[in-house]
Structure formats: C-alpha cells, structure tokens
Amino acid sequence: MKDRVTLVTGATRGIGAAIAKTLAEGGAKVVGTATSQAGAEKVTEALTPFGGRGVVLNVTDAAAIDATLKDIEAKEGAVAILINNAGITRDTLLMRMKDDDWDAVMDTNLKSVFRLTRAVSRPMMKARFGRVVNIGSVVGSMGNAGQVNYAAAKAGLIGLTKSLASELGSRGITVNLVAPGFIDTDMTQALPEAQRTKLIDLIPAGRLGTPDDIAHAVKFLCDEHAGYVTGTTLHVNGGLYFT
C-alpha cells in the first residue's frame, strides 16, 4: 500500500485513529476526517510524521464529500483506499426511538458509505485498483436490544459490501467489511467494573479487543496481496460471535 492515497473517515480517536496510524506506518498517504477543526488538527498531529493530514468532513453532507475528495485529489491524488469508519449511536428502546434517532444513524453509518464509495469508485475503476473496507459491528449480525437503528445500519453494510464486491470486482477493486466485537475504547472504559467483567466473561478470548486488533485486520485487507479477498465480513471479536 506504499504511497496509496487513503481516506479514513472518523479518524479522531479509537478504531479510526488506530487504522489511520497503522496504514500511515505501512506507507500509505493517509487523510483522516474529523467532525471539527480541533479534531482535524489532532489527526494532522498524529499523521504528520508519516506525511498524512486531517480534514474536517461531515459525512452526511453530499456537497462536503465532493469538496473534500476534490481537495484530496488536488493535493495527494485520487483515493485508492477508502476506509468507511465514521459512525454514531443513538441508543434507546424502540418505543422511545424518534425518527430523528433512526435517520441520524442511517445517514451517518450507512448512507455516507454509499455516497463515499460511489464517489471514489470511478477513479478506482480507471486505475483498475481499489480497496474499500467498511467498519461494521458484531451487532450487525447478532442484533442488540436498544440498538435497532445501529444494528439495522450495520447489517445494511453487510449487504452493501457484498453487492459492491460483485459490481466492482472485475475492475481490480475489493470491498470488504471488518466487524469489531467489544473493543476497549472510551465507551467501554466508562462502564462500571462489574459490567466490564460481565462483558469479558462472554468472550472466549478473555479480554476486550483493542483498536489495534481492528487496524491490523484492516491493513491486511488493504494490501496488494489481498486482491482475491472480496465481499467478505471479517469478524474480529475474540470468539464472541461465530459465523
């Protein structure tokens, strides 16, 4: 992936930050997105040693996507590797869930992936090379009470990934999905110790995953030698869920 122009959405912290850093260390020219200027500056600080940078992008804004991709093409070149990581949650039980809760999660977690992948696919087809990795969730396969919107969006990514793999495979483009299990991030660190212990007891590996666990799985799928892997969902969950 050396010198491949790479776009990682949601690169400020956690899984996204780990992916951006790991790919940059591998030689990719990484641009990571954030939702604020402060976040973009944080991404730039992390990626500058590797020649990367951060940018502000609202992934639900179609015009902003177009403008950002034009900026990247002018400065780094056409995107060859796309990591669709940006995501939000609006957790609540179905009877309490508002339309806005549903729409916000769908727009960020699913529709943005459609828009971004559509936008980068043409230059990828022209180059006859591309890597698209969507970041899903074990919840997209298992479901989870209180996360109907999130689970539906992540399950939708599985179908999107398979369909795009079929459409784009003849052009040297692979499309895959990495589905993390329970990862040690800000969210899980905020859980009470008893709840964290209960969570870990469900995992045969006996621990929470780390952002680096996900990042290295993504790195494999981005490699030139992974060109025969496409349309797959790679579960990285310590044995919590088996396909």
Task: Give the ranges of each region predicted by the language model.
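Residue(s) in the substrate-gating loop at a strand-loop-helix junction
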Residues: S137
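Alpha-helical segment proximal to the catalytic Tyr-Lys
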Residues: R122, S166-S170, G227
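Conserved glycine-rich Rossmann-like NAD(P)H-binding loop of the short-chain dehydrogenase/reductase
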Residues: G26-V43
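Active-site helix of classical SDR
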Residues: T117, A153, T161
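Short, small/polar-rich loop/turn modules that mediate ligand/substrate recognition or access, typified
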Residues: G169, T174, V229-G231, N237
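Substrate-binding pocket helix/loop in short-chain dehydrogenase/reductase
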Residues: L93-L94, K98-M106, T188, L199
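Conserved glycine-rich cofactor-binding loop
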Residues: T12-R13
